[in-house]
Amino acid sequence: MSNQAAKLAKFLLEIKAVKLSPSEPFTWTSGILSPIYCDNRMVLSYPEVRTFVAEELAQLIQREFPEATRIAGIATAGIAHGALAADKLNMPYCYVRPEPKKHGLKNQVEGEMNPGDKIVLVEDLISTGKSSFQAVEGVQNAGAEVIGIVALFTYGFANAMEKFVNAGIPVHTLTNLPTLTKVAAEYGFIQDNELATVNRFAENPSAWGESL
């Protein structure tokens, strides 16, 4: 657990971007029932946290993907974080929808993206990886190459991470669920029984929901 990962985890807990509800689980877009919900949009409302995230994402992109020619946010929650990071790096920016619009220009990529561009996608969080792969497909359809994905947070689900490995797409995040739970326990944001519930969920998300 790096100092910066722990710092962001504490920020997310302090601004209540992370919500716990073991007795009344959240239903994700994917249909997964979860005792935890991470709303990284909250980061945008807090200047100190917003600046920290933008700087950390920019440094992460610069360190891991120096060959990148363009940053692309993943709609919708990754749009703002991607734009802020691209601004720090003074790099071209666009964003990618899950699918082409049904009207107007019917774009999936909004903004300029050129064939041959080396793209780093910016996501707010990674759970099942579905939205990330939809964006990857959109970039590839535009004739560009996804060289990596960065995100604020990952649940670290094994199935999702395996998909990225198999696709040959490196993924780097600023913090993750194990760090978050450790920091939450250390600073009293979470009770022992809640911690045990989150840990069981992380081990097997589908089985946890089915056991309710």
Language model: regions and residue ranges:
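PRPP-associated nucleotide enzymes
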Residues: 1-122, 130-212
